[in-house]
C-alpha cells in the first residue's frame, strides 16, 4: 500500500504539472480547452469550471488536455478563432513544448528543494571489489579513485557508475583511475555481449564495485537466524572458518553462500577473547532454482574510510537551486545519450523500466525520507520531459517537428505523411511499452 500511494502521488504530481504546462500556455495563446484529465479511462471525478471540464480517471499512466480542434470534430463558428489547429505554428509549438519544459523546470525546483536541506556526496573511490565480477576481472583495486570513463571526467560516485553502465554494452570501457599509491592507470572493462552485461539493468547498475569498505566485524545479527542461534552478536570479529583465516567479508559471504545446510566451524573474537561456534546456513532457493546458504549476518562498514569518501554540507538556497539546474542538465544529457545508444544498438532494452519498477522505486525512495523522494520525483520528471521531447510522432516532440516544418514551409505537411508518421510513432511507443512491461515482470520474478 505504501508503494502504491507513493507511485500514485508521483503520477498525480508529474502528470498534472505536465498537462498544466500545456493548459496554461494554451489559455495564454487564446485556445479553448475543453477537458483537462489526469489518468486515462472513464473519469470517476469531474468538475466544470468555465469552459474546461477537470477530470480524474482510473488508469494513472498519463493524462491529456483536450482543446477545441476542427480535426477532431465539428466546431461551432463562434469557437473557430479559439481552435488549436487554427493558431499560428509558433503558438502551437509553444503549447506543445510547454508540457515537457514544465517537467524539466519542475526537476530543477525539486532538486533545489532537496539540496537546500543538505547534500551528501560520495567521492569516486573504490572501497570494495567483489570477487569474480566484471569489476574484479577489469583489475579494480580497493583505494582506486575513478577520474574518468571513456575520457569523460567524473566528480562523484554516482556519475562514475552512470557513465560506466551507459558505455558497458557499447564495447570496451576505459576507466581512468588513480591507484591507492598515487599512480595513474586505466582499468579496461570488456564485458559487451556477455551474459553478465545483460544482467546489469536488473542489478541496478551493479558491476561488483562498492564505494564503501566493509570489515570482518558483524554489524547486525538477524533474529532467529543461524548466526543468532550460534550465539553471535554485533561487534564480533570473524577470524577463521573451518580452520582457514578470513581475510575479508567477501570470503565469508562466498563460503556461506556455497554451503547451504552444511556445518561451518567459525572462530571469532569478542572483547579480546577467541570463541568458536558451529553454524549451519539456512538453505535458500533463488529464482533460477539454485540453492545458496544464508546465516543472517550483516557486516560493519569501515567508519574511517566512510568519513574519507563522504562529504556532507548544506549549500545556500541560491546555490542549492543552481545545483538543481546543473543536476537537471546532467541527467537530461545522460537520458539523451541513453536513447542514442538504444537506437544505435549500443545499449540494451533491458534498461527500460515500466510502471511496476517505477512504483517499486517510488516506495523505496519514500521510505528513505523526503529528500530521497523529492530526488526520485525530479529524476522521473526529467525522464518524462526528455522522452516527450523526442522527435517521435504521437509524442510532443513529434508534433513539434510537424509544426516547425509547417512554419518553415508555409503550409502543413501532407496528411498522408502525417498519418504514416503517427502510425509509426504509435507502433514504436506500443513496442516500447511492451518491452517496459516485460522488463518489469522479469525483474519482479527475479
Swiss-Prot record:
Protein keywords: Cell inner membrane, Cell membrane, Hydrolase, Membrane, Metal-binding, Metalloprotease, Protease, Transmembrane, Transmembrane helix, Zinc
Residues that hold Zn(2+) according to the record: 18, 22
SMART domains found in the cross-reference section: PDZ
A single GO cellular-component term on record: plasma membrane
Residues annotated as catalytic: 19
Spans traversing the lipid bilayer: 93-115, 376-398, 419-438
Cofactor: Zn(2+)
Residue ranges of every copy of the PDZ domain listed in the record: 100-181
Record localization: Cell inner membrane
Entries under InterPro entries matching the protein: PDZ, PDZ_6, PDZ_sf, Pept_M50_Zn, Peptidase_M50
Pfam name, any one: PDZ_6
Record protein name field: Putative zinc metalloprotease NMB0183
Gene Ontology biological process: proteolysis
